[in-house]
Amino acid sequence: MDSLSPKRAAVLAFLQQQAQAGLAPSLAEIAQAFGFASRNAAQKHVQALAEAGLIELVPNRKRGIRVPGGAGPDALLALPVLGRVAAGVPIGADIGLDRQLWLDRSLFALRPDYLLQVQGDSMIDDGILEGDLVGVQRSSDARNGQIVVARVDGEITIKRLERSADAIRLLPRNPAHAPIVVAADADFAIEGVYCGLIRQG
């Protein structure tokens, strides 16, 4: 499986877990589970897995995918996409269940609880680009220097945390953006810590 892309490995793990549960998902169900725009994208991954000998396809059957092995219970994560997070000027809270994606656990350094879609370019020097989906682990605390998702006066942003004796600053990773200095009377909370990202497309 070393030669598989992260997305293709996640599709294989999904099929293995479904097989363990006695299920054989259709292409439409695979596309829905991974947020693919069409059945064709699911077909591409399934066909590649079959050509690699990792699954078997039974001709002329809607649910004709056979999987020889099974995945461990922690190989896949079902993560909700809960809206957008600003990598730039903070944006108003846009938290609500958008969709759910199945992702390979190995994509993330920490185990995330949910995903947010990045809007803006303030974190590009950390490799976080507009449109990326970032994994977030719920936490009300973080270490100095960690990338956090923070709420400032009702708005949400992703930045590096810098705490000193007299101030909290949220640091961008793009010289075109200024740090956010959190006022003493601001409604400030750390919502979670950054776990990693996936780039769609």
Swiss-Prot record:
Subunit structure as annotated in this protein's UniProt entry: Homodimer.
One Pfam match: LexA_DNA_bind
DNA-binding region listed in the record: 27-47
Catalytic EC class: hydrolase
GO cellular component labels: protein-DNA complex
Domain of life the protein comes from: Bacteria
Keyword Transcription among UniProt keywords: yes
Record protein name field: LexA repressor 1
Single GO molecular function: serine-type endopeptidase activity
Keywords annotated in UniProt: Autocatalytic cleavage, DNA damage, DNA repair, DNA replication, DNA-binding, Hydrolase, Repressor, SOS response, Transcription, Transcription regulation
Residues annotated as site: Cleavage: A87, G88
EC number, UniProt record: 3.4.21.88
Function description: Represses a number of genes involved in the response to DNA damage (SOS response), including recA and lexA. In the presence of single-stranded DNA, RecA interacts with LexA causing an autocatalytic cleavage which disrupts the DNA-binding part of LexA, leading to derepression of the SOS regulon and eventually DNA repair.
Reactions the enzyme catalyzes: Hydrolysis of Ala-|-Gly bond in repressor LexA
Gene Ontology biological-process annotations: DNA repair; DNA replication; negative regulation of DNA-templated transcription; proteolysis; SOS response
InterPro entries named in the record: LexA (IPR006200), LexA-like (IPR039418), LexA/Signal_pep-like_sf (IPR036286), LexA_DNA-bd_dom (IPR006199), LexA_repressor (IPR050077), Peptidase_S24_LexA (IPR006197), Peptidase_S24_S26A/B/C (IPR015927), WH-like_DNA-bd_sf (IPR036388)
Catalytic-site annotation from UniProt: S122, K159
